[in-house]
Amino acid sequence: AGFTGSEVGNKYPKDPEVLKKALELRGVEICNQWFSSFLITKPFEEVEKEFRAQLAFLKAMGAKVIGASEQSHSVQGQMDTPIFGHKYEMNDEEWDTFCTGMNKLGKIAKEEYGIALTFHHHMGTVVQSLAEVDRMMENTDPEYVSLLFDTGHFTYCGEDPLEVVKKYVHRIKHVHLKDIRPEVVEQVKKENMSFLAGVRAGAFTIPGDGCINYDPIFKVLEDAGY
C-alpha cells in the first residue's frame, strides 16, 4: 500500500526481533507507540518502571518518539460513561504532580534513550481542551516534553486545530491526522454516548471525509519544517 512507517498496534508482536522481521518484510519502520501514564494516581516509580520498559522496546525498534497520555481517571474506555460533561478535572496539586512527572519522564526518554516524549491530548482524559493543553505546555520543559498534535481530538472537543498548530508548531514532534463527522459528534452529545460508542458510530473518519480543512494545517507544518 506504500506505507513506510507505523505506530505499534495492539496486536503487534511484543518481541522486538519478531516484530522487526515482520516489518522488514514489508519495508515498514516503527515511529511511535502509545504510553499510558498514571502520574496522579500511581507512585512515580511504578510509572517510571513501565515507561523504561516501553522505551527499551522502542529503542530496539529504532523509534524516535513515544506518545504519552495521562490515563488517571480517564473515561475514554468506559462504555457507559458519556464522553461530554463527565471528564475528570485536576486540582492544582494534581497539575503540579502531573507536570513534574512529565518533565521527569521526558528527561529520561531524551537523555537515556534518545527518544522524544510527545504528549497526546485525548477526549475523556485530564488533558483534553486547549486550555488544559496550554496549562501543560506552560508548566513543562520544552526540552523534554513536546506535543503530539491530534487534529481529530481537538476538533471533537470543539477546538480549532489550525489555531493550535499555529500556536505550538515548534513544540510538535508527532502528528495524528483524523477527521471528524460533526453530525455524529452532535448525536454523541444528544444521546449522551460514550467515547467508544461514538467511535463505533463513526465520529472519526479519514482526512478528507469529514469537516476539517487540512490545507492550512499542512502549510503551517510544512513552513515550520515538520
Give the predicted meaning of each segment.
Residues G5-S6, T100-C211:
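Acidic/histidine-rich catalytic cores of soluble enzymes
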Residues F44-L147:
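Active-site acidic/histidine proton-transfer and metal-coordination neighborhood
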Residues C31-S37, S74-G85, S194-G198:
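N-terminal small/glycine-rich loop or linker at the start of catalytic domains
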Residues A1-V65, D92-K104, P142, S146, ...:
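N-terminal pre-domain/capping segments
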Residues L23, S69-S74, R181-P182:
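Short glycine-enriched loops at secondary-structure junctions
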Residues G9, S69, K178:
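Conserved residues at the C-terminal ends of beta-strands
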Residues D15, I40, V75-Q76, V126-V127, ...:
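Generic structural signal for helix capping and beta-alpha/helix-loop junctions
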Residues V28, A63-K64, I115, A224-Y226:
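A short helix->loop->beta-strand "cap" motif at the edges of active sites that frequently abuts
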